[in-house]
A protein has these predicted regions:
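Secondary-structure junction motif
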Residues: 133-134, 148-169, 236-240, 244-245
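Short beta-strand-centered segments that line the small-molecule binding cleft or hinge
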Residues: 23, 27, 42, 65-69, ...
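A short LG(V/I)-centered, amphipathic sequence patch enriched
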Residues: 1-14
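Alpha-helical linker/hinge and terminal dimerization helices associated
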Residues: 2, 21-43
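A late-sequence structural motif
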Residues: 62, 213-249
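Hydrophobic hinge/microswitch elements
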Residues: 85-90, 94-98, 104, 157-213
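N-terminal winged-helix
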Residues: 37, 43-74, 78-82, 87-91, ...
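Flexible hinge/capping segments at coil-to-helix
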Residues: 112-149
Length: 249
């Protein structure tokens, strides 16, 4: 063993080894105190309410799992989730009706907001199994807009993106029906009322149990970024900051 102190008539005195041990012990106790303070602060912010507004694509594909894992880590934080179109998400954040907004790119009026990358998705063509295009491995927009289309309501960033490409390429689209949900689109397409464009995550889980097929869209616009919008770091509160960090980690 190593002697840590000398015994003297007047008491004890630390040896050089004892002095070294004292330094390390001081560091350890300081670290414990810092950790204790951090945990106390952590427990204080692990409750509260976070208002989240998100578009249909993110709610369908990504948020269920992300919010589930977050809620398990922070059961005392309540999340109020609303669905809106991407343009509606931006308005909601700007008007301070939401702490965190999740939307698809190519939406206007995002100035004065902090925009953060969240996820990415890929759009595919969805057709019934007997549709003439079903034998193709890939398609371009000019190949499928000639067929009757089932789309989302006005204001949807997905529909706006398709409409923009139709206009950009001087095409004409035969839009037959509009609906408000991916579920509605899947049902309409399976019933033979048209074809549609959906994010991969909104259709892949249903392929085995349906008569639907997907075809890759071989164009750059079919790859999208999903973004997060906040006013600024101070506007979302400590509970909101925990959720934001969880979403982007």
């Amino acid at each position: 063993g190593v002697n840590l102190f000398y015994r003297k008539k007047t008491g004890v005195e630390l040896t050089p080894a004892g002095l070294e041990m004292q330094k390390h012990c001081t560091k350890i106790f300081n670290s414990i105190n810092i950790m204790d303070e951090s945990i106390k602060e952590y427990s204080l912010v692990s409750s509260g309410i976070v208002r989240v507004t998100a578009n249909l694509s993110s709610i369908t594909q990504f948020l269920p799992e992300d919010l589930s894992t977050f809620s398990k880590k922070f059961p005392k934080i309540k999340i109020k989730l609303k669905e809106k179109t991407s343009s509606g998400v931006i308005s909601s954040v700007k008007e301070s009706l939401s702490d965190i907004g999740i939307f698809s790119e190519h939406v206007e009026n995002t100035e004065r907001l902090r925009i953060i990358d969240y996820k990415s998705d890929t759009l595919v063509l969805v057709v019934p199994e007997y549709q003439p295009l079903v034998s193709k491995l890939t398609v371009k927009i000019k190949d499928f807009v000639k067929f009757e289309m089932v789309g989302l309501e006005k204001g949807s960033s997905l529909q706006a993106m398709i409409d923009k490409q139709v206009q950009k390429q001087n095409l004409k689209m035969k839009k037959k029906l509009e609906t408000v949900s991916f579920e509605g689109i899947r049902g309409m397409v399976e019933a033979g009322l048209g074809i549609s464009v959906l994010p991969t995550g909104a259709i892949k889980p249903y392929l085995k149990s349906s008569k639907l097929k997907i075809i890759k869209i071989d164009e750059e616009w079919a790859k999208r970024s999903i973004k997060i919008a906040i006013k600024n770091d101070d506007s979302i509160g400590k509970a909101g900051a925990l959720l934001l960090n969880h979403l982007i980690s």
